Amino acid sequence: MPRHPFSPSFLAASVFCAATPALAALQPIAEAPLAGETEFRCQFNADNSTDCVSTYSFTILKPSGREMLSRIDRSYAETDSLIVEKAELTQPGGKPVPLDQSQIDTRTAPNPDQGFLRERQTSLAFPNLRVGPRISYTLREHFTAKPLSTQFHYILSRPPMPVRDDRFVAEFKAERPIFVRSELMDAYRIEQSADKKTLKVSLKKPQYTNYINEAGNAYLRHTPRLELGSSLDLQDNFGPFAARYNEILAAELPKGAAAAVAAVKGKPAREQVAGLMQYINDTYRYLGDWRASERGYVPFSLAEIERNGYGDCKDLAILLAAMLKAAGIKAEPTLVSRGDVVWDLLVPGMYAPNHAIVRAEVDGKTWWLDPTNPVFAPGRTMPDIQQRWALVLGADGKVRRDEIPLEAPGDTLRVTRSEHYTHDGEARVESRVELSNAPLMQLSVADRQRGRTSTDQDLCRNFAKEGSDCVLERDDSQFVLPPSYTISARLTDRRALDRLGGEYFYNRQDLASQWDAFAKYRSEGQLAELYLGEPQITSYDISLSGGKTDEPAHSCEIRSPWFDIDLQAEPAKDGGYHYRYREVQKTSWLNHDEINSAEFGKLIEQSRGCVEQLRLVVKLDKRP
């Protein structure tokens, strides 16, 4: 489902995408590749359509800025329209030169990976671009109303980007009052008329905000954002959709779906849900189809979905809800914003959610079901829809807000491993690994998409620094995941110990890498928030033999709001060593202030020190 009714700039695809996952410090303004000016006016019409006229101007300051403007694309629905009213290039000291019509191309836009779209795409290619010239273009756009939408909703997002913002002015008009909600818009002047039907937004002074060299798992969860809507009421915005969903749900189940419901009849509710999720996974593929019309949030009918054999999120969600209801399980279609990053709900309008799921009540508990996923863990919410708001379309036609909680930490990874060293630093390894939750989901998806042989090769690489003779024992992975899944491995690690001079060392640098990354965040002055994935518990029970170490017993017990760590390590009777390490990750996000706090700094120091205790000098037996 689309998030934005339209983009404020042709640069959205290239610039916005570069700025979403932030990559450390703020880039100096002297390094800005482009200088930009934006001015646009939009009218929200009585029929819920929108008309906009916008002018964008960019001056190329650096060679990289030229590449950003190399080709400018704009895709739009077949039912919408776009006219390039003016496009011109101005060389330094010269006069504006209109862009030749041969450099403006309009064609059918390419389809997405998993769907059909009826979209057009207009592209502009300015000639003779180099450092210094200024390009400018003016667009006139008309956006038709989405099916069943009775309220307008507009999102103006101003994230950091590699463009020096010299001027920004936006004006909005409507035939009914405009409700305004915003966050982090202090750099902008927001003026609204007395009748609330006109709004002007302008940048107070030029600015440049762009992040560089942030971590790979860094994001900006809060950026300057303004949202406009004709109503702040959930029912006003989504009531018509709830009514249509209920009309579809009231229809008789098609033959295949009815047979699937009959097949699980009489089983415990948990097994019925798993059986119906399995049926959808086996029978339907995820594919969005907008060829006939722009459907917006409106699903196909149940009969159409079965006839097609595919559907997008709203199609599969309403089919699952219908089947669950037929099985006697309370189920309601639900709209959410899917992904690692979810915005706060400022205006509950139609562009706030981007995904459809099902809220079900199973054995007295709430399950959040996403039938578009290639795996299903009964009773557990998928990581990309946890910890966020949800708009539930009730059977009574009422729309209500609910909250999807963050899952509590579970035993995600449990490793029992023995390493027996030979005289040359190799080790014979036997390992038993129990997976659940996210790692098990990843394993099942890898088997499905790449095949078991490829997955096994990856697993063997993870069992050793330099492995050979790797033999794995594991069951076939399934769509419906068990509570835990066991992998047994036997192999030789040819580089089990690090050698320095004439000594051999055992270490767990893999356990230290996370704390090294946090320390790097602090020392480099990184700014964004870090996404850690869902809360989890990892534990290791490790036995080392075949050599001797003089390392004494060690223990750690570290407690914090973010992580708990326990270590129990002691010499073994045979001269080897044995330790148990357990780490509990309690949160999915760490923000800038948390990471730079004194308490988190203490956590880094303690955790590094704890892992450092597992650096052992190993004296190997002599060559036989």
What positions do the PLM features span?
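Gram-negative bacterial Sec-dependent N-terminal signal peptides
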Residues: 2-23
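A sensor for short, sequence-defined functional sites
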Residues: 24-624
